Regions:
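N-terminal Sec/ER secretory leader and immediately downstream segment
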Residues: 1-57, 61, 65, 206-210, ...
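Solvent-exposed, acidic/flexible segments
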Residues: 10, 29-32, 36-44, 55, ...
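Short, flexible domain-boundary/linker segments around small modular repeats
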Residues: 13-33, 96, 154-175
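Extended amphipathic alpha-helical interaction segments
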Residues: 40-170
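A cross-kingdom marker for long, charged
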Residues: 127-221
Length: 221
């Protein structure tokens, strides 16, 4: 997958220098999601080995870690008013986009403020989604540890889980995630459209640093 990532980012560099469109962003997003799915499927044999080797004590430790992680999430993202959460999201978005584009101009900041105020999902939704995913994963772990299925059967269950990750959500949950994804991509397209030549060079350089990282990883394999 690493050479494919590098090639895709190289193509995105050229798109940025011309005019990055919403359709191109959708294509890039779909490519990344499909690549993650393929990489996850390739890891299934290793994951099955790991899960079958776990002890009950290790599973209990995993549950405690998840409980602590969830408590940290609640403290960091849910222990504030809706307005404070919006401000927090704005600061996080600003940090991310400054990293990619360089310093944003006044018009881009205005676009971000409008998009942030109208964000289609909140932190509570992502927390609920997080809990659902954790329970699905723990159910697989319990199945492996308690029933000790044969390797092929566990691999099949893991493959079903991975393939269903983006396909088996409820209609309501998937609709919210789709709206959030579209909202994010539209914001990126708008920021790129209003980007200066310097910002485009910054974005190309940022993508090049990732390409270089991928190239190093490929050479080390």
């Amino acid at each position: 997958e690493l050479p494919a990532y590098a090639n895709q980012l190289s193509g995105a560099q050229q798109q940025v220098l011309n005019q990055l469109t919403l359709e191109q962003l959708y294509d890039l997003n779909e490519f990344m999601r499909a690549s993650i799915e393929r990489a996850s499927l390739k890891a299934v044999p290793m994951l099955a080995d790991l899960m079958l080797s776990l002890s009950s004590a290790q599973v209990d430790h995993l549950r405690r870690q998840l409980d602590q992680s969830n408590a940290d999430f609640r403290e960091e993202y849910l222990a504030f008013s809706p307005e404070q959460q919006r401000n927090q999201r704005y600061d996080m978005l600003l940090e991310q986009f400054n990293d990619w584009f360089g310093e944003l101009n006044a018009q881009q900041l205005a676009l971000m403020r409008v998009a942030n105020a109208d964000w289609p999902v909140d932190n509570q939704f992502w927390y609920a989604e997080r809990l659902i995913r954790q329970q699905e994963m723990l159910a697989l772990v319990d199945y492996a540890v308690q029933q000790q299925p044969d390797h092929a059967r566990l691999e099949e269950r893991l493959q079903q889980y991975i393939l269903g990750f983006e396909r088996n959500r409820s209609v309501q949950r998937q609709a919210k995630i789709d709206r959030s994804r579209e909202h994010t991509l539209r914001l990126i397209a708008a920021l790129a459209k209003d980007g200066s030549a310097e910002q485009k060079r910054h974005l190309v350089a940022r993508a090049q640093s990732l390409i270089d990282d991928f190239s190093v990883l490929v050479a080390q394999r």
